[in-house]
């Protein structure tokens, strides 16, 4: 009988970037098992100038990264809406969300919002309520304080599923 390989848990942080509230969620993925670790959000004061809000987001994420020590990160891609200025500002928050883990030497994956919904719920156009229901099933101990924290957990789950699929494809290919 062949011994089963030991599967080490991988700690993953999901980040849902935003200027008002940047959600974060940390899980551990071990084989098919997902374990809730923590979640929350970084909320810079609205009255700060943009540069200072971006700094507050960076400092908040750096604290979370230092406290939870994830090995991998995933960030939601920005969707382009009709308000070009708002899209550009959100892109700046997303840049900070990608920079913070990179400064800790953590690789960062990116996922489109509909890819996150499809992975977690099974439908690319799922609503926040459907995501919340699936989070309760997949991570029963999680009680996200905001929709942004819930989205961040969904992003982390998406990364866990996609990295597992990638590892399986590499194993089948003999790499």
UniProtKB/Swiss-Prot annotation:
EC number(s) recorded for this UniProt protein: 3.1.21.10
UniProt GO MF annotations: crossover junction DNA endonuclease activity; DNA binding; magnesium ion binding
Keyword annotations of the record: Cytoplasm, DNA damage, DNA recombination, DNA repair, DNA-binding, Endonuclease, Hydrolase, Magnesium, Metal-binding, Nuclease
Pfam families per the UniProt record, alphabetical: RuvC
Origin species: Bradyrhizobium sp. (strain BTAi1 / ATCC BAA-1182)
One GO BP: DNA repair
Protein name per Swiss-Prot or TrEMBL: Crossover junction endodeoxyribonuclease RuvC
Keyword DNA repair appears in the UniProt entry: yes
SUPFAM superfamilies: Ribonuclease H-like
Gene3D superfamilies given in the database record: Ribonuclease H-like superfamily/Ribonuclease H
Active site, renumbered: 16, 76, 148
InterPro entries (UniProt xref): RNaseH-like_sf, RNaseH_sf, X-over_junc_endoDNase_Mg_BS, X-over_junc_endoDNase_RuvC
Subunit-structure text: Homodimer which binds Holliday junction (HJ) DNA. The HJ becomes 2-fold symmetrical on binding to RuvC with unstacked arms; it has a different conformation from HJ DNA in complex with RuvA. In the full resolvosome a probable DNA-RuvA(4)-RuvB(12)-RuvC(2) complex forms which resolves the HJ.
Family: Belongs to the RuvC family.
Gene Ontology, cellular component aspect: cytoplasm; Holliday junction resolvase complex
């Amino acid at each position: 009988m062949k011994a089963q390989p030991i599967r080490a848990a991988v700690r993953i942080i999901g980040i849902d970037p935003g200027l008002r509230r940047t959600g974060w969620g940390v899980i551990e993925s071990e084989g098919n098992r997902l374990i809730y670790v923590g979640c929350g959000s970084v909320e810079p004061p609205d009255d700060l100038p943009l540069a200072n809000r971006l700094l507050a987001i960076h400092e908040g994420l750096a604290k979370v990264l230092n406290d939870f020590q994830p090995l991998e990160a995933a960030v939601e891609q920005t969707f382009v809406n009709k308000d070009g200025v708002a899209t550009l500002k959100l892109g700046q928050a997303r840049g900070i969300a990608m920079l913070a883990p990179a400064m800790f030497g953590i690789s960062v994956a990116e996922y489109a919002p509909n890819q996150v919904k499809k992975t977690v719920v099974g439908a690319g156009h799922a609503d926040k309520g459907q995501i919340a229901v699936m989070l309760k099933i997949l991570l029963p101990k999680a009680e996200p304080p905001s929709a942004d924290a819930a989205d961040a957990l969904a992003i982390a789950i998406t990364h866990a599923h996609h990295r597992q699929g990638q590892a399986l494809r590499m194993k089948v290919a003999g790499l």
